């Protein structure tokens, strides 16, 4: 997976010049909503943008593993924001802080009394090749209907 959109930039710039601010806002709303839906499904399936499963949980000190899928409530917390110049999809507040630890596999102290813990990388947000194709298809469909 790569978040590199360099090959799409010239195409997107030409399209951007043809649309007015209201049309750009509608397009950005449509793109962010569609991508949020895809990302929600992917998080619920416990997969990263590459399609690989998340790293499983480690055993605790007693030797048992917590039951249930990680990030069960997370899809509900995925937010979108858009205007004529941008479309954003991500998490806000404390959820964003926690997810950054998982996204990049950081080492933190879960609470003040515990030792530092290294979290494995569990990429929850990012663009897959399918997402890029979805963006292209949505833009084409939008332009055909305008």
What are these regions (language model features)?
Residues 1-146:
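Short, Lys/Arg-rich flexible segments
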């Amino acid at each position: 997976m790569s978040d590199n959109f360099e090959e799409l930039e010239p195409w997107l710039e030409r399209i951007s010049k043809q649309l007015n601010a209201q049309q750009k806002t509608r397009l950005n709303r449509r793109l962010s909503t569609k991508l949020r839906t895809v990302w929600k499904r992917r998080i619920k399936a416990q997969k990263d943008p590459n399609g690989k499963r998340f790293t499983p949980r480690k055993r605790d000190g007693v030797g048992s593993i917590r039951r249930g899928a990680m990030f069960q409530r997370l899809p509900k917390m995925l937010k979108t924001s858009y205007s004529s110049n941008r479309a954003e999809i991500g998490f806000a507040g404390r959820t964003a802080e926690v997810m950054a630890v998982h996204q990049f596999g950081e080492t933190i102290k879960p609470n003040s009394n515990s030792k530092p813990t290294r979290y494995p990388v569990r990429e929850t947000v990012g663009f897959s090749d399918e997402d890029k194709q979805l963006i292209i298809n949505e833009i084409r469909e939008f332009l055909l209907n305008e």
